[in-house]
Amino acid sequence: MGLMIFAYIAIGAVLGAGTGYLLHRYVSAKRIGDANELAKRIVEEARKEAQAQKKEILLQGQDEIFNQKRELENEFKERERELKARDRKLEEQGERLEEKLEKATQKEHEVLAIEKELTRKERRLATLEEELEGKIAEQDHRLEEVSGLTAEEARARIMEEVEARTRHESAKMIRVIEMEARETADRKAKEILASAIQRYAGDYVGEQTVTAVTLPSEDMKGRIIGREGRNIRALEAATGVDLIIDDTPETVILSAYSPLRRQVAKMALERLIQDGRIHPARIEDIVRKCEQELEVQVREVGEQATFDAGVHGIHPDIIKLLGQLRYRTSFSQNVLQHSLEVSALCGMMAAELGMDIKKAKRAGLLHDIGKAVDHEVEGPHALIGADIAKKYGEGKDIIHAIAAHHEDQPPKTALAVLVQAADSISGARPGARKELLENYVKRLEDLENIATGFEGVSKVYAIQAGREIRVMVNSENVDDDQTYMLCKDIAAKIEKNLTYPGQIRVTVIRERRAVGYAK
């Protein structure tokens, strides 16, 4: 029984093993078949994809070839059009050249015909000239026989007569032209000057060489003088100004030719009086502060002057020098006010003449800038001013106008002459500058004495406040030519021996009277 069970188990195991083996073989075979089918499908799909890519590449290549072919065809057509256009242009040019050639040929024929005609006329003219020369020679021979002169002698006499007549007529014409030009120029100049003078109406107050400072009481004079005069000596030493105390009640007079120093002294004295502490150390401190304040005021005055004149872009150092001109005088005329006046006159006259108004105003404003430092630098103030203008970058025309306004250099530009004229107008107008009566009388006497010293002078009159001198000469001793030379000599001697503002007109008068009696 147990054996049978074991046998059954063994048989079952064998059958199970066989069945498992067969089942394994079946499963393995199925897997291999599936793998083969999968491989075939992959290969087929790869082949199809390769065929598709091949077709796509072929299509792209065909499209690219087609596009390139189309571009080449378009380019070929464009070249063909250009060549046809060029051919048409060449044909047109050829036709034009043929027309020009035909015209040139026609003109050549015409020129040849004209040359032939000219040659014929030249031959005819030569024949006529020969005949004319023969007749002229015959006439000359007859004239020589009749007049008793050779042809050369007659020609020389005729030339002398023609030359004399021509010289006389040309001299007369030149005198007329010069007279008309001089009259026109004088009239125009007077109109321009009169217009400028009438249009300018600036205020003017004569400058003094003293300044008065009012004191609160007479006792203040003793405090200003100080013990043994130490305060007044310290103030005079610090400012360079003379203090006059005893002349006027409750007033101190500051005397100095420098308005700048007088202004510093006035500011310092007023501040000391207000402060009440007056001693040498305090005086020096106050004077130093007043000098610093005045420097600021000087710059402000210069800036205001450029604003009033309408001139811009001036170097700051020149503006400071302009401010210093406020404290300079010339014949009691304030130099800054004079410069503003010259600037305005230059602008007005430049407008009348069609010149640059801004440049004229600038030259007029800066023309006396050298007076701000002429006490520190040697030389004429005009040349000093020109050097200053050159140093700070002013234009050549401005520099020359400054240098030439007193003829330290000969004026070479219209602007220089314009500044000269405006400077003379500002300084020479009545009341602009003051002179002492004795100096004025002496100058007139010197003028008359200079002219009287020349030979042939009978009477001399200095008129127009010494700005014109009229000289009467003896007509029997001095002729017209000598009158002209005498006028030049008197003017030259006045320039050499006298110093004066502006200019002096010299007029020499020669009068000849003829008296007859009818009986």
Swiss-Prot record:
<dbReference type="InterPro" id="IPR006675">
    <property type="entry name" value="HDIG_dom"/>
</dbReference>
<feature type="domain" description="HD">
    <location>
        <begin position="335"/>
        <end position="428"/>
    </location>
</feature>
<dbReference type="InterPro" id="IPR003607">
    <property type="entry name" value="HD/PDEase_dom"/>
</dbReference>
<keyword id="KW-1003">Cell membrane</keyword>
<keyword id="KW-1133">Transmembrane helix</keyword>
<dbReference type="Pfam" id="PF01966">
    <property type="entry name" value="HD"/>
</dbReference>
<keyword id="KW-0694">RNA-binding</keyword>
<keyword id="KW-0378">Hydrolase</keyword>
<dbReference type="GO" id="GO:0005886">
    <property type="term" value="C:plasma membrane"/>
</dbReference>
<dbReference type="InterPro" id="IPR022711">
    <property type="entry name" value="RNase_Y_N"/>
</dbReference>
<dbReference type="GO" id="GO:0006402">
    <property type="term" value="P:mRNA catabolic process"/>
</dbReference>
<dbReference type="InterPro" id="IPR004088">
    <property type="entry name" value="KH_dom_type_1"/>
</dbReference>
<keyword id="KW-0812">Transmembrane</keyword>
<feature type="domain" description="KH">
    <location>
        <begin position="209"/>
        <end position="272"/>
    </location>
</feature>
<dbReference type="InterPro" id="IPR017705">
    <property type="entry name" value="Ribonuclease_Y"/>
</dbReference>
<protein>
    <recommendedName>
        <fullName>Ribonuclease Y</fullName>
        <ecNumber>3.1.-.-</ecNumber>
    </recommendedName>
</protein>
<keyword id="KW-0540">Nuclease</keyword>
<dbReference type="Pfam" id="PF12072">
    <property type="entry name" value="RNase_Y_N"/>
</dbReference>
<dbReference type="InterPro" id="IPR028987">
    <property type="entry name" value="ATP_synth_B-like_membr_sf"/>
</dbReference>
<dbReference type="GO" id="GO:0004521">
    <property type="term" value="F:RNA endonuclease activity"/>
</dbReference>
<keyword id="KW-0472">Membrane</keyword>
<dbReference type="Pfam" id="PF00013">
    <property type="entry name" value="KH_1"/>
</dbReference>
<feature type="transmembrane region" description="Helical">
    <location>
        <begin position="3"/>
        <end position="23"/>
    </location>
</feature>
<dbReference type="InterPro" id="IPR006674">
    <property type="entry name" value="HD_domain"/>
</dbReference>
<dbReference type="InterPro" id="IPR036612">
    <property type="entry name" value="KH_dom_type_1_sf"/>
</dbReference>
<dbReference type="GO" id="GO:0003723">
    <property type="term" value="F:RNA binding"/>
</dbReference>
<dbReference type="InterPro" id="IPR004087">
    <property type="entry name" value="KH_dom"/>
</dbReference>
<keyword id="KW-0255">Endonuclease</keyword>
<comment type="function">
    <text>Endoribonuclease that initiates mRNA decay.</text>
</comment>
<comment type="similarity">
    <text>Belongs to the RNase Y family.</text>
</comment>
